[in-house]
Every structure is written in C-alpha cells, then in structure tokens.
Amino acid sequence: MVKIGLFCAAGFSTGMLVNNMKIAAQASGVEAEIEAFSQSKLADYAPNIDVALLGPQVAYTLDKSKEICDKCDVPIAVIPMMDYGMLDGKKVLDLVLSLISG
C-alpha cells in the first residue's frame, strides 16, 4: 500500500485529481491511499505518507517542502501543469510510481 499526499493551496482543488488517481490505481492493480491536503499541513502529514506531490499553484514552495520531506525520507515532486489541468490520474500515478521506484 502506497500512501500518497497531494498538497495544494487549500486542499480542495486536487479532489477531482485524487478521484481519477484512485480509479487509475485500481485499474492498474496498485494499492494506494490517496488524499489531498493544504500545503500548509505538509509537515503534519509527511511522516505518515510515502510520496508527496505539490499542485502547480504551490510549486513556489518546493524548496521548503523538500526540506520537510527530506527529514522523513519522503520523495516529493510538483505535478506537471498539463497533467494537473487535464486531471490525468494515470500520468500522475505514473509519476508517483517513478518516485518510489528510484
């Protein structure tokens, strides 16, 4: 089971993407727990997730967010704007899988 946290400005705008990622995970046979949170809560959730993704609207926080995630050995990346805008759950799930595989 991979625990994935998506972090955006308020934790709401990623809701539809989370649903599409859950559908993609189920279709691919990937056991995943995927939730959306406000970026301001990253430090609270980082110890309990396997991968963190930032929404494009909070990409400016990547350096600070990476410091938080590095302390917990959690890989982090910014969701590509195109994948985010198209709500492409499969591509974002593929990004997660690439982060945890190496």
Model-derived segments and spans:
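A short, gly/pro- and small-residue-rich
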Residues: 61-81
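Short acidic/histidine-rich motifs immediately flanking catalytic phosphotransfer sites
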Residues: 46-52
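Short, well-ordered alpha-helices that flank and scaffold nucleotide-derived cofactor binding pockets
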Residues: 19, 23-26, 67, 94, ...
